[in-house]
Amino acid sequence: MIELTVAQIAEIVGGAVADISPQDAAHRRVTGTVEFDSRAIGPGGLFLRLPGARADGHDHAASAVAAGAAVVLAARPVGVPAIVVPPVAAPNVLAGVLEHDNDGSGAAVLAALAKLATAVAAQLVAGGLTIIGITGSSGKTSTKDLMAAVLAPLGEVVAPPGSFNNELGHPWTVLRATRRTDYLILEMAARHHGNIAALAEIAPPSIGVVLNVGTAHLGEFGSREVIAQTKAELPQAVPHSGAVVLNADDPAVAAMAKLTAARVVRVSRDNTGDVWAGPVSLDELARPRFTLHAHDAQAEVRLGVCGDHQVTNALCAAAVALECGASVEQVAAALTAAPPVSRHRMQVTTRGDGVTVIDDAYNANPDSMRAGLQALAWIAHQPEATRRSWAVLGEMAELGEDAIAEHDRIGRLAVRLDVSRLVVVGTGRSISAMHHGAVLEEAWGSGEATADHGADRTAVNVADGDAALALLRAELRPGDVVLVKASNAAGLGAVADALVADDTCGSVRP
């Protein structure tokens, strides 16, 4: 964050100082980072008091100041130097931190944080900062990681860790930028119409990227049309002097070209795009290879990330880097060198016993679930060696009235892709629908065991991650391939972590 005095911050957010004199507030400077976890605070930092499930952020204010925080941003005096803002009604937001906000104090701190980020972003943009916004129903984090890699050779990049993309993570990321930052990459998530527009007001992007319109959070939005309208808030926010990168292979995204005043850059898997990929092939771990075409030049790309769907993510990252002045050759080299970064997102690990774990346990919606299953099938069914495949799947959250049908479709798809073992984790109607869909699809098919899998092909429903892990440890064989995927609330990341951490052959049958 840029250096500001406590008094300057109080003026920006409309707060009053407490437990610090006006004279001291005018001289005490915030020189460190903004943190909502008191354990992460450092010298000169700004600590955000936010409500938690087990503890009130006010309870940690003293420890944050003891650790070096210059001041606390809170909704009431906390006995240490603070900027106090009055409670407000909780808005219709995505940030789960307001789940325990019973008195409006958390909403007040979030509103103040947004004001501070808005002021800082304006100063940094005036100094030459380029802000890039990314939205889409899926792929935001993977695209952000690739984009950070391709922009790094051009200057200093700030991007959110993991999926910090809501009303807390978005301004928090903005405030990581300093006067040395050249590129600020921001993920922009939404559960309601207007969410993306609100985020764009905090840090107006000069480049916007829309990946896709899918069914993530369908239960919150109500319809796919509303999802498209909400994603379109990003291109609508980009000024005429900026650029909007659109996935031309998604009709709902392509239609957004008429909604923006900015210049449109289309990416595609065929030559209809301004930036496009030549023939795509996958290696034995489903890592894409393709020729990148743009600006009458071309270069070969070999991605280090898993899944055919990563091609579009890479094209969007490439288009942004090209807009920022990189050459096609530079972009291709950076994409090829980019490793997987964010945890639990299509991370592929092959253990010493030959078991391959595809960890995509951070989140799930129907589109990303299909992509994960397709990657699993590709890895398991290589011509030189067919391997047993396991799909360990949990619930896809927030699908509303479509939840039963979508889970049923995923269960059936697992059978159609010839997955050897489907382990459905959890309870409830959606989980039952996924399990029953697989069972019914198997019965509807030939009913005959395949030569590769014999009687091994089964679909089972277990109660939780511990039960799934116990089953896997008992039944895995050397060379098996395991996909672990669910919405984050299912907690299957712990299953993937345990599988990767298991001693070589220590828990696998010979």
From Swiss-Prot:
The pathway is:
Cell wall biogenesis; peptidoglycan biosynthesis
- Drop me one GO molecular function for this one: UDP-N-acetylmuramoylalanyl-D-glutamyl-2,6-diaminopimelate-D-alanyl-D-alanine ligase activity
What catalytic activity does the UniProt entry give for this protein? Answer: D-alanyl-D-alanine + UDP-N-acetyl-alpha-D-muramoyl-L-alanyl-gamma-D-glutamyl-meso-2,6-diaminopimelate + ATP = UDP-N-acetyl-alpha-D-muramoyl-L-alanyl-gamma-D-glutamyl-meso-2,6-diaminopimeloyl-D-alanyl-D-alanine + ADP + phosphate + H(+)
Q: What SUPFAM superfamilies would the database entry show? A: MurD-like peptide ligases, catalytic domain, MurD-like peptide ligases, peptide-binding domain, MurE/MurF N-terminal domain
Keywords from the UniProt entry: ATP-binding, Cell cycle, Cell division, Cell shape, Cell wall biogenesis/degradation, Cytoplasm, Ligase, Nucleotide-binding, Peptidoglycan synthesis
Which parts pass through the membrane? none
Question: Could you confirm whether the keyword Nucleotide-binding appears in this record?
Answer: yes
Chain sites annotated for binding ATP:
136-142
Taxonomically, the superkingdom here is Bacteria
Question: Cross-referenced Pfam families, in alphabetical order?
Answer: Mur_ligase (PF01225), Mur_ligase_C (PF02875), Mur_ligase_M (PF08245)
Q: Which GO terms describe its biological process?
A: cell division; cell wall organization; peptidoglycan biosynthetic process; regulation of cell shape
Where in or outside the cell is it found?
Cytoplasm
- Which Enzyme Commission numbers does its entry carry? 6.3.2.10
Q: What is its main location?
A: cytoplasm
Choose one Gene Ontology CC annotation of this protein and give it: cytoplasm
Look up keyword Iron and say if it applies. no
Q: Which InterPro entries match?
A: Mur-like_cat_sf, Mur_ligase_C, Mur_ligase_C_dom_sf, Mur_ligase_cen, Mur_ligase_N, MurCDEF_CellWall_CoF430Synth, MurE/MurF_N, UDP-N-AcMur_synth
What the record says about family reads:
Belongs to the MurCDEF family. MurF subfamily.
Function as written in the Swiss-Prot or TrEMBL entry: Involved in cell wall formation. Catalyzes the final step in the synthesis of UDP-N-acetylmuramoyl-pentapeptide, the precursor of murein.
Enumerate the HAMAP family for this protein.
MurF
Q: What is this protein called?
A: UDP-N-acetylmuramoyl-tripeptide--D-alanyl-D-alanine ligase
Species assigned in the record: Mycobacterium tuberculosis (strain CDC 1551 / Oshkosh)
Its organism's taxonomic lineage begins at: Bacteria, Bacillati, Actinomycetota, Actinomycetes, Mycobacteriales
Which gene underlies this protein?
murF
